[in-house]
Amino acid sequence: MKQFKIAAAVLLVIGISACSSLKLTQTDFAWPVESVLKIDGKGNVTDNRFSYTVNVKPLFFEETQDSLSYTSKELRMIRDAKGYYYATAAGFKNVYIFQVNDGAFTLSEKVMLDEKGMNAPVMNQRPPYVELINGANKYLLNNEGLKK
C-alpha cells in the first residue's frame, strides 16, 4: 500500500509538470519599417515579406462608409514589439490597431488623428511606440492608443 501511494504521488508530480504551459518571453514582434500594400480588385492586400493576406474592404467601409473606397488605394501597416498591427491609409481620419485572434485581425483600438483625413501618413518604429507622421504632425501610438 505504501508503494502504491509513492507511485501515485510520483505520477501526479510528473503529470502536473507535463501539463504546464510553455511561454517564451522577451519576444520582439516589431517590423523595422511599415509595409505599403496595394489593394487588389477583390479588396485583398498581400505582404509577401511577412507572409499574410487579408481582405481590407471592411476596414475601408468602416472608415468611409463607401463599399468601393478601397479601389486604387494603398494600405500602410506596421507591427509593434507586442505583436499589434497598426493600419491606416491616405484619406483616413483614424489609425486602426489590431491584434490577431483566432486567425483574424480583431480591432483593439481606433484612434482619431485628423478630422479632415491624413494626406500622406507614414509609420515608423520609435520603441516603445509606433510613430505616425502626417506632414508636420507627429504622433506616438501604442496598443492602448495615442500617447498623451
What are these regions (language model features)?
Residues 94-95, 138-139:
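Structural signal for beta-propeller blades
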Residues 99-103, 143-146:
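Short loop/turn segments that connect beta-strands within beta-propeller blades
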Residues 17-33:
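Bacterial Sec signal peptide processing site at the extreme N-terminus
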Residues 87-91, 131-136:
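Conserved beta-strand positions in repeat-built beta-propeller and related beta-rich domains
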Residues 36, 60-86:
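Beta-strand-rich domains and repeat architectures in extracellular enzymes and scaffolds
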Residues 46-64, 106-115, 148:
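Beta-propeller fold detector
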Residues 69-78, 115-127:
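Repeated scaffold domains used in trafficking and secretory/extracellular systems
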Residues 1-20:
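Sec-dependent bacterial lipoprotein signal peptides
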